[in-house]
Amino acid sequence: MSRPTGACPHAWRHQQQPLRGRMWAASPAFRRQLVLLRSLLPSPPAPSSVAGFPPSCPSCSSFLRVRTNHAMAASAGTVYEADAEAVVRRITPPLDRARHKGQAGKIAVIGGCREYTGAPYFAAISALKVGADLSHVFCTKDAATVIKSYSPELIVHPILEESYSVRDDERASVSSKILTEVGKWMERFDCIVVGPGLGRDSFLLDCVSNIMRHARQANIPTVVDGDGLFLVTNNLSLVEGNPLAILTPNVYEYKRLVQKVLNCDVDEETASEQLITLCQKIGDVTIMQKGKADVISDGKTVTQVSTFGSPRRCGGQGDILSGSVAVFASWARHFVLTNEQPTEKRKAASHAFEKNKRSTVTSDIIEFLGKSLEDICPAEH
């Protein structure tokens, strides 16, 4: 059935979306990450010129108004809560039987060593739970078997090496071989996550630095978390001037970034202005400062997500976030390329805590990731 001229192509969703779904949309479950996605979008044109989305549709054009308001007040350091519903509906790909494997996203996690095997698993499996079709992990040989045993859904590559397993006279050749092996896959990925379970071995970090440079040359969005932030803090050129780089520091990682880049301590009195300055100083990156309230900026605007998640601060929740952000970043970029671009993790954490209370662990939160997206974009539609 053809729709009337000027009608919103998503009108059926607006009409059928129950109140409960709208409550999910307004929740932190999507606001937290979708602010990051909006940062990846180019500045929007006037509503009347957005292809397929007439200005008469308030839901589909609301993110345009939000961006305009942000731009007007950015200089004043105003902090906004994100409007996620319109954005998530626009970027989430439909579950179409005509689509083939991989079209909903191919994500790669770069991390995993002898000491840390859980973090890369959490990031990679979260990407699948949110909706990516394929999730890869590039890790050391010591970590590969362990990570493979966690889940048969993950594609695990035992490619990375640590210093103890490489002779000094072999470092150059081994590093080149690692980059070549990862490079064979790079063009297939929609986004990579660097850092979960990476560790701080000097040779391994050098190899990952080369991988990040290769990803940048290939224009692959890169989410940097965990020890990837340690690497970037000590080598800012890896992300300087890269609008496809998303940094997700916790309070300690953010403090180190501020001290390194701005040569000062974190100032709570001017937190939003300092975050904007940090993004601008690094150049074009998006930063999500995790904490009691998550604060997100692309160097132009600042958005805060303060809705309650879970009081349980078990390890691994940041890894869930990085894997989820990678999926949304890939969907947003695909939307931009074919049409003209956080909250989910907090909502999932809240539901997991309601069910498990003090025994809540990271795998319980992962269980609710799919539900968070389903309430916004039902699979049957």
From Swiss-Prot:
Domain of life: Eukaryota
Named cofactor requirement(s): Mg(2+)
Top class in the EC scheme: lyase
Key words, A-Z: ATP-binding, Lyase, NAD, NADP, Nucleotide-binding, Phosphoprotein
Domain YjeF C-terminal intervals: 84-376
Catalytic activity reported: (6S)-NADHX + ATP = ADP + phosphate + NADH + H(+); (6S)-NADPHX + ATP = ADP + phosphate + NADPH + H(+)
Function: Catalyzes the dehydration of the S-form of NAD(P)HX at the expense of ATP, which is converted to ADP. Together with NAD(P)HX epimerase, which catalyzes the epimerization of the S- and R-forms, the enzyme allows the repair of both epimers of NAD(P)HX, a damaged form of NAD(P)H that is a result of enzymatic or heat-dependent hydration.
MF term (GO), any: ATP binding
ATP-binding among keywords: yes
Binding residue positions for ATP: 290-294, 309-318
Binding site for (6S)-NADPHX: G197, N250, V251, Y252, E253, Y254, K255, R256, D319
PROSITE patterns assigned to the protein according to its UniProt record, in alphabetical order: YJEF_C_3
EC number of the protein: 4.2.1.93
Protein name: ATP-dependent (S)-NAD(P)H-hydrate dehydratase
SUPFAM superfamilies: Ribokinase-like
Family as reported in the entry's similarity comment: Belongs to the NnrD/CARKD family.
Coiled coil: none
Gene Ontology terms describing biological process: metabolite repair; nicotinamide nucleotide metabolic process
CDD domains per the UniProt record, alphabetical: YXKO-related
Pfam families: Carb_kinase (PF01256)
